[in-house]
Amino acid sequence: MKTIILYGYPGECEISEQYLKEYKIQCFSEQEELVPALMETRPAAVWVIMEKAAGMEGVIAVRRIYPDLPVIWFSNDGGFAPQAYRLHVNYFMLMPINEDKIMTALKKYGFHAP
């Protein structure tokens, strides 16, 4: 079973988990929890579901450990799209999260969409 790490607010993680039932999900809301989890095992992808600078800091933390890992970033601020591009984020999308956005992200990276 593929593992997807969700780094985001608890409510957003719960919404995402509804659509990711076929995956082992680990959800973290603090960067201090995210980094050790990334170092323990390489996930199939990381989904950053944070707004503004908090989301960018999460992406930077992932990129320091896994420069080539698929990263999907959901933000509430489209102004962070240039930073997403600079940080080689694979998929940048604006909140709110919904089923269509999740399914698009899954299909784009070769995951089986439930």
Where are these regions (language model features)?
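Extreme N-terminal starter segment of soluble prokaryotic enzymes
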Residues: 1-4
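Two-component/phosphorelay signaling modules centered on CheY-like receiver
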Residues: 6-33
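Alpha-helical elements of the RecA-like P-loop NTPase motor core of helicases
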Residues: 14, 36, 82
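Short acidic/polar alpha-helix capping motifs at helix-coil junctions
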Residues: 22-25, 43-48
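Acidic, metal-coordinating helix/loop segments flanking the phosphotransfer/catalytic sites
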Residues: 29-45
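CheY-like receiver
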Residues: 45-113
